[in-house]
Amino acid sequence: MERDVEDEQVSRDHSPGRATIGPGFASVLVAAQTGAPWALERLYHGFSPVVLGYMRIQGAADPEDLTNEVFLGVLRRIGSFEGDEEKFRSWIFTIAHSRLIDDRRHTGRRPHLAEPHDYHWDRAGGDAEQEALERLSSQRVQALCEGLVADQRDVLLLRLMAGLTVEAIAEALGKSEGAVKALQRRGLANLRKILERDPVSL
């Protein structure tokens, strides 16, 4: 019965492009921190699709395995987490990016985008160039991002795919907010140049 009450408080919008628990997040978090299986399952199903998509689009050797490792890390440390849903998203992607970097270091894989898939891109908002970019198909964005340096690509994918704020991206990547803003500006400017050379219908 307790689970039914909690479930009613939770948003059912779990689109793969934006992990959303909704107004019931605080209740779900408290339950998860006490080890309630239903709450841990809710967090996993709410956030794992976008983490898996991020791993795939970043060309991880085994994206499913890395995603599972991310959530094992979340499970081990969730008792110490404090914050709202936005902070939780940032925290998860901090863990995810760290695992991705470790995987690249151990396997010797260079950053390389995966083959295009039809991922749902989050609508993070922003300036005209970013909004235009968000209207492109996910396959086209992947192809365009292939031409960016790794740091610019990481920032734009976290902004567009995960829907993180500049502050959250800075935390996830271990950079200053100013550095993230600069990378986003340069990345969008480079994408605009690519689009001017190879225009597509927006």
PLM regions with names:
Residues R18-G22, D102, R110-S138:
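Internal acidic/polar
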Residues R12, Q33-E41, L52-E69, E177, ...:
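Short, charged helix-capping/linker segments at alpha-helix termini
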Residues A143-E146, A150-D154, A162-A179:
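Helix-turn-helix DNA-binding module
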Residues A19-P23, L29-G53, V141:
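A short, charge-rich alpha-helical start-of-domain segment used by transcription regulators
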Residues E2-E8, R12, E171-A172, L188-L202:
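C-terminal edge and immediately downstream basic/flexible tail or linker adjoining helix-turn-helix-like DNA-binding
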Residues I57, G79-G83, T94-E115, E134:
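Arg/Lys-rich amphipathic alpha helix in sigma70-family domain 2
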Residues L43-A61, R77, C145, E196-R197:
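Amphipathic, Lys/Arg- and hydrophobic-enriched alpha-helical face
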Residues D65-L72, E86-S98:
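Structural recognition of an alpha-helix C-terminal capping motif at a helix-to-coil junction
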